[in-house]
Amino acid sequence: MTDTYLHETLVFDNKLSYIDNQRDTDGPAILLLPGWCHDHRVYKYLIQELDADFRVIVPNWRGHGLSPCEVPDFGYQEQVKDALEILDQLGVETFLPVSHSHGGWVLVELLEQAGPERAPRGIIMDWLMWAPKPDFAKSLTLLKDPERWREGTHGLFDVWLDGHDEKRVRHHLLEEMADYGYDCWGRSGRVIEDAYGRNGSPMQMMANLTKTRPIRHIFSQPTEPEYEKINSDFAEQHPWFSYAKLGGPTHFPAIDVPDRAAVHIREFATAIRQGQ
């Protein structure tokens, strides 16, 4: 169904595809931001949950989409510019950004640049909130290596599946994300590593927003109690931050528990409609 909503446009001399269901609703538009090395297909089940009630837009990043291709290097700053340009072309004013994984770097910078009137709230899904631990740092190093990047992806796939035979997620990993080669995976390792280096951690980046506003982290992984504790501690220190555990089996709640993710999106969208 989602591919019927697929469009193309020219953004800063780059031909980008994007999803827009063109639903005429009383705002905000829901802006779903993919992470690296996947595209609008990661959100196809979540779009089904939201389609009837919201305008839903999903930008595909440079080199991403149904026909991935090699492109000049870019990072999350360019992703922010591309997303805002697509919204401007579509005449979208108020929007609720929702990100998956390291699309979170885009979301926070998008909040900074768009300001609280245009983007009053944000939702991040399954984003590693602490500084990279050794295993993840090793994965980033492998992704950057043209000889070993596939080893890096296989290790990440195992972590993300967490021993579960979740058919929808396996299809996404092995059929959809498999479309992407070293150009994209290597770039993801470089950009993510650089983002942690620049910002310290996602929590530090959020805390450094010029104008903070409600942000909620909804996640299934990691499952360690200490991970929930850092979210809880951050929420206690920053009243604008909240979190919710979704209890899904994998790193992809938009695929395996889209109904649970949609509950939080509806809550935040309703608050925006009510001027909160």
Curated annotation (Swiss-Prot):
EC top class named in words: oxidoreductase
GO biological process terms held by the UniProt record: catabolic process
One Gene Ontology term of the molecular function aspect: oxidoreductase activity, acting on single donors with incorporation of molecular oxygen, incorporation of two atoms of oxygen
Induction context: Expressed from a large linear plasmid that contains the operon for quinaldine degradation.
Keywords of the record: Dioxygenase, Oxidoreductase, Plasmid
Effect of residue 102 to Q: Reduces enzyme activity by about half
Site entry (Increases basicity of active site His), positions: 126
Residues engaged in binding substrate: 36-38, 100-101, 160
Catalytic residues of the enzyme: 251
EC numbers on record: 1.13.11.48
Cofactor note: None. Contrary to most other dioxygenases, this enzyme does not require a cofactor for catalysis.
pH-related activity note: Optimum pH is 8-11.
Catalytic reactions on record: 3-hydroxy-2-methyl-1H-quinolin-4-one + O2 = N-acetylanthranilate + CO + H(+)
InterPro entries per the UniProt record, alphabetical: AB_hydrolase_1, AB_hydrolase_fold, AB_hydrolase_sf
Residue span, AB hydrolase-1 domain: 28-150
Family classification: Belongs to the AB hydrolase superfamily.
Role description: Ring-cleaving dioxygenase involved in quinaldine degradation and utilization.
Protein's name according to its UniProt entry: 1H-3-hydroxy-4-oxoquinaldine 2,4-dioxygenase
Classification lineage: Bacteria, Bacillati, Actinomycetota, Actinomycetes, Micrococcales
Gene: hod
